[in-house]
Amino acid sequence: MPNAGRTLAGALVATTTLVLGIVPTAGAGAVDDATLTPRTDFVVQPLRPDGSTPPPPANGEKIPNIDSVKATVRTYYGATGTGIAHKTSSPYISEITALQQDVLDALPDPAPRPDLAVVLDVDDTLLWTYDMVDAAMHFHVDPEVRDEEWVQPGRFPAVPGMVDFVAEVSDRGYDVYALSERSPAQEEATLANLAAAGYAGFTRDTVLTGSRAAQSLVELKAGLRAGLEAQGTTIVLNVGDQYADLLGGNAEETVKLPNPTYYRPSPNIEGAPTSDADLVLPTEFEMAANGASGRTTPGDRIPNVDNVLAEIRAYYGAVNGIADQQSSPYLTQMTAFAKRWKQKLTDVCARGMRKGLRPAVVFDADDTTLMTYDMEDAAMEFNYSTTLQNVWVQESRFPATPRMPGVVAAAAKAGCTIVGLTGRNNAQRVATLDNLARWYHDARGNPYFRSAHYFTKWTSSDTPPAHVDCTVDGNPAGCSSLDFKASTRRLLQERGMRIVANFGDQFSDLIGGSSARPVKLPNPTYYLP
């Protein structure tokens, strides 16, 4: 961890998956890098109707990496690195305009009788919130900021193609209504925003809002539709980007628009149609780590950001962004992981010492020896900041990665040299060693990580060391952390060390050989190619 900006770049990843902690035992450098690739198949359960989170996977590697999810979403929306969606061409625009055409092809022209209506949700059905959700809020929506800086000023553009879609539906003789969970206090701003976005004909009588007090989202929307039907209107079509927009009946047909950027769970109403059971998100997903799947994957086949974040937090037992340090699926996994590797390292280090091989074990820093979760979630809300990261580093604020002090101690006691190898830069070296010394030391307080065997990356103003081969990652245009780490392991072995194991939470910590055993720790909170 971390490189400045922490962007996802490079060639498409392969699809082979390395099972956590199960690695080849071939000689140094003999491990095939093609096996060191992120998994691409996932099962993600949506939030329950009451908003609670289903049990997460016991293995963190089975949780979609949130950086990869965001990269996939941005590819799907044709979004820039700053989170601004492309307004004229993207996989999202292609999918949603095709859906609009399919609906128009099936909708009788003209309307076969009076008092037939099409009902549409507002946010991400009529008005497009993507730039707010990504660029302004980084997928962490603040209701107050949303209201004051986006809803009231009317800053949302129209969802691509929907202005023409609504006009065509109206021209065919159907009444058009907008139903929204926006509050009555936001009604005037919503009407003005719809007009500014290009919609004609919406009035206070056709844009219906309601208070969510003491009722669920489904109850609100179904109640508004029931009110229209009580006035003699037949709703032939209900369109929304959330299944909660569609549940509860009172519409002959429903159309779900794609939206992987957030998820609104809601209990259904009593007496809802049995067909509502089909109105659910998929749970099985295929996703490449680098975001490329967004070019070809339908929007609702991308893991939903809200559901993935909920799963990650449940895995770490996090409350308000702070991981549970006493009990969580992550701690359970790390306990089993540490038990296995303490014994393995005790055996292999002792064997190396008997053979006079100068055995060594290499450890990455972030989320291998030092746990960054609270910074990533509570402090950054999964929106990485190099400035804030440096504050945490310089103040040595990170706890030890659970159970890893025992792993390091076992290797040291069995005779292995403890080597630290991190993408943190030289200006963070002293603070990192100080942070490690708090958690990684022998009974007399002597630190296991020592300056002579601790390697940090150069700063942007430094020249890379002569031993670094900047082509290891296949990109000669620059020197990556992968280049630095692989080259440094090679240098250590050239100097006579035998690296019996290399521990890291990123596959880029492990690729490049010069280690008998690459060992991957779980980390769904960020991805470094």
Name each model feature, range by range.
Residues 7-15, 19-120, 271-363:
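Non-catalytic pre-domain segments flanking phosphatase-related domains
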Residues 134-153, 377-395:
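A solvent-exposed, charged loop/short amphipathic helix patch at secondary-structure junctions
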Residues 102, 106-110, 129, 133, ...:
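Structured segments of extracytoplasmic/periplasmic soluble domains
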Residues 147-177, 184-185, 389-419, 426-429:
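Short, acidic loop-to-helix structural element flanking the phosphoryl-transfer center
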Residues 32-41, 68, 183, 187-292, ...:
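C-terminal cap/substrate-recognition subdomain and adjoining C-terminal extension
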Residues 110-118, 174-181, 206, 236, ...:
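Surface-exposed patches in mature extracellular/periplasmic domains of secreted proteins
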Residues 114-129, 359-372, 420:
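Asp-based phosphoryl-transfer active-site loop
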Residues 1-5:
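N-terminal secretory signal peptides that target proteins for export/translocation
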